[in-house]
Design a protein with these regions (language model features):
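Substrate-agnostic recognition of the 12-TM MFS/MFS-like secondary transporter fold
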Residues: 1-14, 36-55, 59-74, 86-146, ...
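Transmembrane alpha-helix termini and helix-breaking/packing motifs in multi-pass membrane transporters
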Residues: 16-25, 78-80, 136-156, 229-230, ...
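Short extramembrane helix-to-coil loop segments that connect adjacent transmembrane helices in Major
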Residues: 22-31, 226-237
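Cytoplasmic membrane-interface "Motif A"-like loop-to-helix N-cap segments
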Residues: 57-68, 261-273
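Helix-loop junctions on the cytosolic side of multi-pass membrane transporters
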Residues: 107, 111-112, 154-184, 374-384
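Juxtamembrane intracellular "pre-TM" segments in multi-pass secondary transporters
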Residues: 174-207
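C-terminal transmembrane helical hairpin of 12-TM major facilitator-type secondary transporters
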Residues: 266-307
Length: 442
């Protein structure tokens, strides 16, 4: 519920930001919006890994509530913007705090829902919430704009963040698992990134996110330019295109639990990428509102199919104790893709036009798909790999588990002492962690 309320509020601000950029920059609104969203991505890319490295030392509930309150304050400042650089600064600060909230929220979900099927449904429902925002926000924005200026939408977003904070305050969250990690704070901050890049399926997923980001950027950055300058339509058409994209995405979110029973997550993700490439080529057709509605609908379908499984893919790749570090790495790296996408979408359309940019992005998406076909391992359906552990003696905090079955220490809770791991060859669901620092080579 907190997510839905915050998302609807954010959706109102997204539309208000597009209108604010157009009012201040005119035909260069795409460039202004692209740079503003790049500021958002910079905050995501550089702040999220820091949170991933230290969040296990903090209360997750208190942290998320604090982030919501700070976001509410920043959004309230939006109506007072008078210079373009004000937009850039406030967008950076707003998303500096969002970069703390979102990956922690994502990592909490599998702690609450440990069953894989239920977690998959939760991801689908989360996507539905996101898509309801795409559908409801333009509608609510359109109604709101009949009675007040777009600056009022920022006020509604601020209230939404405060409501989200109150809901989280009264929500019971499970205690986070103890983290088995050695080293200083810098090592902890970089841990998630290192583990992410050592996992083949996650490297392939990241390449696919390049394609996802490019398709998404065309929608987010250039819809206002496409509607105003290419179609000559009004603000209502802008809201309509966003709504059609949300409808396509929500349709696939409803169907995902059924698809997951007959297709694996790798196949579903790749199918989404194929649809995104088709939709980008489709966008290059002569500008028409009818063509645009169908193209935006296809993009929504592709974005939903390609992104919903990512949570399960990251979750299966991570030791539960390291889950937040993996999710923050995923959050940071994928938003780096969006950073590049936003800048490229704004500049290329301005320099070469909408049609050329759509075709160029479509070709890159095809390349991303081919990479995943070649380098995403097939054994991921089970994630059980044969591997060898070297003989080692070390010290770190740990619990008694299959890798720590010694009984020379009486404490059954988390404890720390020097202990020995003999050389062993075995197989089990494999994740990069303190005791599995490199992916097995076959």
């Amino acid at each position: 519920v907190a997510q839905v309320i915050a998302l609807v509020g954010t959706g109102l601000s997204t539309i208000a930001l597009a209108l604010l950029a157009y009012n201040m920059a005119g035909s260069e609104a795409g460039r202004v919006l692209g740079i503003a969203l790049a500021c958002k991505m910079i905050a995501y890319v550089f702040f999220a890994p820091i949170i991933g490295g230290v969040i296990h030392r903090l209360s997750r509930k208190s942290f998320m509530i604090t982030m919501d309150i700070l976001r509410a304050f920043i959004v309230l400042l939006m109506p007072f913007v008078s210079e373009i650089w004000h937009i850039y600064l406030l967008i950076f600060l707003l998303n500096f705090f969002s970069a703390g909230f979102k990956p922690v929220f994502q990592a909490v979900i599998p702690d609450i829902l440990e069953d894989d099927e239920q977690y998959g449904k939760a991801l689908a429902y989360s996507r539905i919430a996101y898509d309801l925002e795409n559908i409801l926000s333009p509608t609510l924005a359109g109604i709101g704009l009949l009675f007040f200026s777009y600056t009022g939408l920022f006020v509604f977003n601020s209230v939404a963040f405060l409501i989200s904070a109150v809901i989280i305050l009264f929500t019971i969250l499970p205690k986070s698992k103890h983290v088995e990690r050695s080293g200083n704070v810098l090592n902890e901050i970089s841990y998630g990134m290192k583990a992410y890049f050592k996992t083949p399926r996650l490297r392939s997923l990241l390449v696919l996110y390049i394609g996802i980001a490019l398709a998404s950027s065309m929608i987010i950055v250039n819809t206002v330019i496409y509607v105003k300058d290419y179609l000559g339509e009004t603000d209502s058409s802008l809201a309509l295109l966003f709504a059609f994209s949300g409808l396509g995405s929500m349709l696939m979110a409803f169907l995902y639990p059924k698809l997951a029973k007959i297709m694996n997550d790798k196949t579903i993700t790749q199918l989404g990428i194929i649809i995104l490439s088709i939709s980008l080529f489709y966008m290059s057709i002569e500008p028409s509102l009818i063509f645009a509605l169908s193209a935006w609908f296809l993009v929504g379908i592709g974005l939903s199919l390609s992104q919903i499984p990512s949570g399960k893919i990251v979750n299966m790749s991570a030791n539960p104790k390291d889950r937040t570090a993996y999710f923050t790495a995923q959050f940071s790296l994928t938003h780096l893709c969006w950073l590049i996408g936003y800048l490229a979408a704004g500049e290329l359309v301005l320099l070469f036009g909408f049609g050329f940019t759509a075709i160029f992005f479509g070709c890159i998406v095809v390349f991303c798909y081919l990479y995943s076909v070649l380098f995403w391992p097939d054994e991921d359906s089970q994630n059980i790999l044969l591997h060898k552990h070297k003989n080692i003696v070390h010290t770190h905090t740990h619990d008694h588990d299959p890798h720590h079955e010694h009984h020379n220490h009486p404490i059954e809770t988390t404890h720390e002492h020097e202990h020995h791991h003999p050389e062993v060859v075995h197989k089990h669901p494999f994740q990069i962690d303190l005791h599995h620092q490199n992916w097995p080579k076959h």
